[in-house]
Design a protein with these regions (language model features):
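Functional cleft and adjacent loop/helix regions within the main domain
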Residues: 37, 92, 106-111, 208-211
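Extended intrinsically disordered, low-complexity coil regions enriched in Ser, Thr, Gly, Ala
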Residues: 49-73, 147-173, 179
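Extended amphipathic alpha-helical regions
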Residues: 87, 92, 108-109, 122-125, ...
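Extended amphipathic alpha-helical interaction segments
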Residues: 94-160
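N-terminal Sec/ER secretory leader and immediately downstream segment
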Residues: 2-100
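A cross-kingdom marker for long, charged
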Residues: 165-213
């Protein structure tokens, strides 16, 4: 799929910034490019959700694939970028939106979009990306079944925070037993957090199969 592009050209010293705060890629040289990207994506998703919760709900209601990717791309408003340009895979944007949605639910936000749940038994899709998606949902379903409180704490933790490190250590023992060998997926923090957030937000009930893993 084509990368989502958000771009904005502004003077750094501009006195007026729209609310919520637009995203900016941190310039801290001690952070890896991946970590800088995670922080910027978090801020971007947070801004987009506040500006267009209805649009986020509509995009996430689309079936996964090119249609949903186009809907996500339309949400990539320049108003949520302080300056410069961001290019990212729509799947990363999707995951960040679910993380922010679940964080806001935990904070008591009552104006969030409703995203329909689904059954893992009805997982469909032939493309590699969709197969990986369902593998991740099955994986996250298993993790939530084994330790839901730890999964919730990990999702709600701020990116690169000490809490994220601690909660990842807490949840690590249940990750291995939930991994199946049928799909090769890189399980980094962002991927794990996004999958857990989707399972938790959409209200998927942990399956008996997951509980038995």
């Amino acid at each position: 799929s084509e990368p989502v592009v958000a771009q904005r050209y502004e003077a750094l010293g501009q006195s007026y910034l729209p609310s919520p705060r637009p995203a900016r890629v941190p310039q801290n040289a001690r952070l890896s490019p991946a970590d800088r990207g995670r922080i910027a994506m978090d801020e971007f998703a947070r801004c987009v959700l506040v500006r267009s919760a209805t649009g986020v709900g509509r995009a996430l209601a689309e079936p996964m694939g090119e249609g949903q990717n186009r809907a996500l791309a339309r949400l990539a408003t320049a108003d949520c970028l302080l300056f410069g340009e961001m290019r990212f895979n729509p799947i990363l944007f999707r995951r960040a939106l679910f993380v922010e949605l679940y964080r806001r639910r935990l904070e008591g936000d009552t104006h969030l979009p409703v995203v329909a749940g689904y059954s893992l038994a009805q997982a469909t899709g032939d493309s590699p990306a969709i197969k990986v998606h369902w593998w991740l949902i099955d994986f996250a379903d298993c993790v939530v079944a084994k330790d839901r409180p730890a999964a919730e704490q990990f999702v709600s933790s701020e990116t690169l925070s000490n809490e994220e490190n601690v909660t990842l250590q807490r949840i690590t023992p249940v990750l291995g037993p939930c991994v199946t060998a049928d799909v090769q997926v890189k399980l980094d923090r962002s991927t794990i957090k996004g999958a857990l957030a989707e399972v938790l937000y959409r209200g998927v009930q942990p399956t008996a199969v997951a509980q038995g893993k």
